[in-house]
Amino acid sequence: MKKVNWLVVAAGLVVGAAAVLLTALGNPGNMGFCIACFLRDTSGALGLHSAGVVQYIRPEIIGIVLGSLIAALGFKEFKGRGGSSPALRFVLGMFVKIGALMFLGCPLRMMIRIGGGDLNAIVGLVGFVVGIFIGTLFLKKGFTMKRAYNLGALEGSVMPAIVVALLILLIAAPSFIHFSTEGPGSKHAPIAVALIVGLIVGALAQRSRLCTVGGIRDAMMFKDFKLLYGFIAVIIAVIIGNLITGNFNLGFEGQPVAHTDGLWNALGMALVGWGSVLLGGCPLRQLVLAGEGSADSTITVLGMMVGAALCHNFGLASSANGPTQNGMIAVVIGFVVVAIVSFRNVAKEA
C-alpha cells in the first residue's frame, strides 16, 4: 500500500469543514457543498428551468472553477485540451445529473449527508460503489473515450469565462436572472464567504486531485488508497463539525432535502458512479478540470446543467416525498445509454 498523501487528507478535511461552515451560514441542511444541487440552482437562475424553489447562482461553483484556474496557472498546469468524444461526454454528464437528482445529491453531498447522520446516504453509497465497480470492469477491458488534443489557451478558458460572467450576473442581479424566495434556492451563505470558500476548495482540489469517484476506483483497480483517504476525511470532518454545531441527526426519516426510497437512492447513485468512471471523475473533479483548461470537462459540466433543466422541466427530479415515475424511467434509460457507451467504447485491441 502506498503512503498516505497528506495533501489529499488536508483537502478532504477542508472540504468537510467548509460544508459545515456554509450550512451554518445559510446553505440548506446537509448541503454545504453539492455540485449537482448548485449547478441545478444555477441553471434555474438562468431560466433553463422554472422550478421556483431551486433558482440561485451559487458562488461556490464560481469559486471552485476560479480556484482551480488560479492553482493551475500558479503551478503551470493550465492547458487548453479537448476533443475526446465531446458529444458522448455531454450526454453522460446529462445522465449523471439525472442520477444525482434521483438521489438528491452528487457524491460530495452523499458524503456530507452521511456526515450529518442521514442513513439514506449509506444506501446511496452502496449503489455508488456498485456503479463504480461496473465502470472499472470496462476500464480493465480497455474502455476509452479516445484521446484529447491540445487546443490552446482560448479553448481552455471557456469555463473560467462563463463563471466570471455568472459572478457579474450574481452581483448585478438583473431582472432576467431568477432568484428563489423560498425553498432550498433561497437558502445561501453570504456571497463573499461562499466565493472565498469555493476558491479555497477549488485550489486544494486541483493540487490534491481530490475526486470522490477516483478514490474508490483506484482502490478497486490498483489497491491505491491515496484519494480514498480524502473521501474518508470529508466524512470525518463533517461528522465532527455537525456534532459541534448540534446538527448531527442519525436516522432515515426527517432528513433535509432527502427521501427514504432505498432502491432508487441506490440506483440513482449507481448511475452517477458508473457514468463518472467513464467520464474520468466526479462532478467536483469535472469542475476542477474545466478550471484548468479541459474543454471536455466544460462540455460535461454543460451537459450536467442541461440534465438539471430536463429534471425539473419534465418532472424527473425526486423530492422529499420520493422519486417520480418519470424520474425512474429516466434513470433506467440512463443505465441503457451508459451501458451502450461502455460496450461500444471498449478498444478493439483490448
Residue map of PLM features:
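Membrane-interfacial helix-loop segments of redox and metal-homeostasis proteins
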Residues: 1-350
